[in-house]
A protein has these predicted regions:
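An N-terminal assembly and electron-transfer interface module characteristic of large anaerobic redox
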Residues: 1-148
């Protein structure tokens, strides 16, 4: 299940005390983002807008939509980036999949023991890559992770 870093959003709202916020994210996360948007509005008593236009990542943040709505902060959810902010009011929020890779990692060990591999993932599983690397290395697989 995809888990959005709601604590970070709440901390930012409580610190900055905006009069309105907007949230956007990829199409697959929109139901969760919509629920979060409604909860923010109720919890903080501020307008919280869902920007439901299709977004394609950090190069397509829809900051214009947030500006049109006069949202003081735009939370872009689920597009991992090495930068936490792109504009003063645009904040990147992680969303990770909490699925376990234990079983598949064990099966990979059987095939890969003694070999060197490159380990890659998508942004929703970045939080697990170091654990998988450690598990594989402990079982005799040499693992390389590049920078992306």
């Amino acid at each position: 299940m995809i888990v959005i870093d709601e604590e970070k959003i709440f901390d930012i709202i409580e610190t900055r005390k905006p009069v309105s916020v907007a949230l956007n994210g990829p199409d697959g996360l929109l139901p969760k983002v919509q629920d979060l948007t409604l909860r923010i509005g109720k919890k903080y008593g501020i307008p919280a807008y869902l920007l439901a236009d299709t977004t394609w990542g950090t190069c397509d943040l829809n900051s214009n939509g947030a500006k049109v709505l006069n949202a003081e902060i735009l939370f872009n959810i689920g597009h991992t980036s090495s930068m936490e902010t792109f504009e003063e009011n645009v904040i990147m929020i992680d969303a990770f999949d909490d699925i376990s890779f234990d079983k598949v990692t064990e099966k990979c060990v059987e095939l890969l023991r003694g070999k060197t591999i490159s380990l890659i993932t998508d942004s929703q599983h970045l939080n697990q890559i170091e654990l998988i690397k450690k598990t594989l290395e402990e079982k005799g697989v040499n693992v390389k992770i590049g920078k992306g």
